[in-house]
Amino acid sequence: MEDPTLYIVERPLPGYPDAEAPEPSSAGAQAAEEPSGAGSEELIKSDQVNGVLVLSLLDKIIGAVDQIQLTQAQLEERQAEMEGAVQSIQGELSKLGKAHATTSNTVSKLLEKVRKVSVNVKTVRGSLERQAGQIKKLEVNEAELLRRRNFKVMIYQDEVKLPAKLSISKSLKESEALPEKEGEELGEGERPEEDAAALELSSDEAVEVEEVIEESRAERIKRSGLRRVDDFKKAFSKEKMEKTKVRTRENLEKTRLKTKENLEKTRHTLEKRMNKLGTRLVPAERREKLKTSRDKLRKSFTPDHVVYARSKTAVYKVPPFTFHVKKIREGQVEVLKATEMVEVGADDDEGGAERGEAGDLRRGSSPDVHALLEITEESDAVLVDKSDSD
């Protein structure tokens, strides 16, 4: 069997206008010229041609897909760049908005300041206009005064009577008013003489008024200086200083006495309060017991002290019986001194509660020995209790 020769023929695809019809090769021409011997060879050739076409189409598709992927990657890169640019633009816009807000705040503050300044300028302008009007009025008044040549001098003088020469100002007004009226009626030749006389009169009187004013001022200053000197002399004189010293000494003595009295009063009040507190804390019975126990301790610590006879009764309860046992200690009989009656006044009423029971003991002229012994025994018991507690 002969090997069949393969001939690749590229057919133009539909839709490509530049594709030209393939030129038949020499071998293809020979095969076309040859008579078709067998149908199998033609089928094989057509299958091979179709496979080649499919491969070429697949290659083209792969190339197109690669191109599409490249363009897609480029588009993704451009999109990422665009996103970065958009983010940067957004950041710049936010910064711009913040700057705009700050500028708006500053502008509003500036506008408020400008409004305040404008209000102040208006007020200043109004005050300046008022001052200008006042200045104009003053200028007009000054011009009128200069034209009239009338000057009223108001002087304050204390304790000085005004001289009679100052009353000439009224006569000056009348004298100036009369020549003006008469000058209109009289001729032109007489006017200058009267004006000159009036001027001379007014100038002389002004000089006299100034001299009187200067003299009165000098006298007033002199008088005030003399008064001040006299006041200083009186204040710092020896008699005044001695009087002040005596007064200060008297005041110091009074204050010392008052302080002493106050201290005595406070001491008495404090003593009373302390006595009250003592009576509240330690009653009179307890105080007497402590006193007797203290005396007993002192006796016990002194050698060769006198032992007095003493009896003590003890009670023992054994139901249904009670036994009273009396213990008698031998010794000398204690001689007690008779105590006088003590009168309690109104001043001692506050301390009466403290010394109530002590007074009762003092009132007895011949107290019972057994009662005294019982008191001493109770004080011993109190001391024992105190030592146990310590």
Swiss-Prot record:
Modified residues (Phosphoserine): 36, 40, 46, 118, 167, 169, 171, 175, 202-203, 300, 365-366, 379, 387, 389
Sequence segments annotated as region (Nuclear export signal): 52-62
Cross-link for Glycyl lysine isopeptide (Lys-Gly) (interchain with G-Cter in SUMO2), residue positions: K116, K122, K161, K165, K170, K326
Chief location: membrane
Protein name, entry field: Caveolae-associated protein 1
InterPro entries xref list: Cavin_fam
Positions of modified residues (Phosphothreonine): T302
The organism of origin for this protein: Homo sapiens (Human)
GO CC annotations on file: caveola; cytoplasm; cytosol; endoplasmic reticulum; intracellular membrane-bounded organelle; membrane raft; mitochondrion; nucleoplasm
Subcellular localization: Membrane, Caveola; Cell membrane; Microsome; Endoplasmic reticulum
